[in-house]
């Protein structure tokens, strides 16, 4: 039998504890993508699957309230890997804990053909699996949603952080030769990260049309909605500035956490057009999305990293039969151009003009735009189709 171990940082989608313990954004996008991949792998019936998770959370005390992380809710689906959540020591603890778990899994199943998928370019995962792979025969596939050198761009980072990050990247590069194949979110990522020219596939994200929520917009207000990271670097204040020029009777609903929160709260106090709702659970977040008239992502295309990332928020939005308004980033394939609506300027007045033009359309016109958007996503980016690309890449790669 072919056995597959999925090593990631997932947690139950509706976990309330992770919100309770977190002091910043919860990694809902990463969590949703992992569960989409897991669902696709499970339904393929190609492997006997084991799930283990060293949960992706911020370090104690600044970003997370727990020093020792074990689990969040009892789960018969996930083996949680405990780790010590102190800065710097955290990654060392995660490495040894993951290595022990993987070694035991390999020993238990050594009579079978073994595959391991690791989610994210996380050095403790890569090093731990590579060390075990040195001593046994297994196929190692790495999913890379973000390049490590472009992570934490929104945070204010110290010289010490950059020093340790450079060491981390050198260690990671050393062990990448043990990876048999990759999944990247954009083709450009391979050119930057795939230094040993291994096989790869590109999966920018996926949607699950089975996700159902009730709309929170009981009054049928005209809502422009953004849910996600709240950093000036990612264009949120530009969007808020645009609202002062919007003539339509609409409201901008914002959910999330980040460095711009205090400014957003202040602007929401000064304007009844801005409605800040704080940090929400995944289900609460998608309920707000489903209540939107138009969904918006204000992230701009003025940084190098946009070539090496895909805005998963856009694909998440595309589930809801709503128009999606965004900037065309370098990492967005051209096939999306037929269904996404793009800002052509970062100028708040120009942004307001496009927002107004959308909200002046009839409900039927907006519904038709949304229908085409969701139809495209369901047909081309559903979790089964996207996961099949990963499975094909793995199975067509020999050790």
Give the residues covered by each predicted segment:
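A charged, aromatic-enriched C-terminal amphipathic alpha-helix characteristic of glycosyltransferases
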Residues: 44, 363-394
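Nucleotide-activated donor-binding/catalytic signature segment of Leloir-type glycosyltransferases, i.e.
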Residues: 262-289, 294
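Conserved acidic donor-binding segment of nucleotide-sugar-dependent glycosyltransferases
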Residues: 339-349, 357-363
């Amino acid at each position: 039998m072919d056995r597959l171990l999925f090593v990631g940082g997932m947690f139950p989608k509706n976990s309330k504890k992770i919100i309770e313990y977190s002091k910043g954004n919860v990694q809902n996008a990463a969590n949703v993508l992992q569960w989409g991949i897991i669902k696709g792998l499970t339904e393929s019936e190609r492997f006997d699957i084991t799930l283990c998770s060293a949960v992706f959370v911020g370090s104690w005390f600044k970003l997370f309230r727990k020093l020792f992380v074990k689990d969040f809710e009892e789960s018969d689906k996930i083996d949680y890997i405990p780790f010590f959540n102190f800065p710097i020591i955290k990654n060392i603890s995660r490495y040894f804990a993951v290595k022990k778990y993987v070694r035991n899994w390999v020993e238990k199943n050594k009579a079978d053909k073994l595959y391991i998928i690791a989610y994210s370019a996380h050095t403790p995962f890569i090093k731990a699996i590579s060390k075990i792979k040195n001593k046994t025969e297994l196929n190692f596939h790495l999913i890379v949603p973000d390049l490590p050198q472009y992570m934490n761009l929104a945070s204010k980072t110290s010289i010490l952080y950059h020093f340790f990050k450079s060491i981390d990247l050198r260690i990671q590069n050393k062990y990448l030769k043990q990876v048999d194949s990759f999944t990247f979110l954009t083709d450009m990522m391979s050119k930057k990260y795939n230094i040993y020219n291994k096989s790869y596939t590109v999966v920018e994200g996926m949607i699950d049309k089975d996700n159902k929520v009730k709309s929170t917009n009981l009054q049928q207000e005209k809502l422009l909605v953004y849910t996600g990271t709240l950093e000036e670097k990612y264009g949120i204040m530009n969007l808020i500035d645009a609202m002062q020029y919007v003539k339509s009777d609409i409201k901008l609903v914002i959910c999330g956490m980040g460095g711009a929160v205090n400014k957003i709260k202040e602007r929401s106090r000064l304007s009844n057009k801005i409605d800040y709702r704080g940090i929400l659970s995944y289900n609460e977040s998608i309920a707000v999305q489903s209540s939107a008239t138009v969904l918006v992502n204000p992230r701009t295309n003025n940084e190098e990293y946009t070539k090496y990332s895909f805005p998963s928020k856009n694909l998440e939005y595309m589930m809801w039969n709503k128009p999606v308004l965004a900037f065309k980033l370098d990492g967005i394939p051209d096939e999306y151009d037929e269904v996404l609506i793009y800002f052509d300027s970062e100028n708040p007045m120009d942004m307001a003009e496009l927002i107004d033009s959308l909200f002046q359309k009839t409900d039927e016109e907006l519904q038709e735009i949304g229908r085409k958007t969701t139809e495209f996503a369901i047909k081309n980016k559903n979790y089964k189709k996207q996961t099949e690309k990963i499975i094909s890449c793995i199975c067509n790669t020999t050790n």
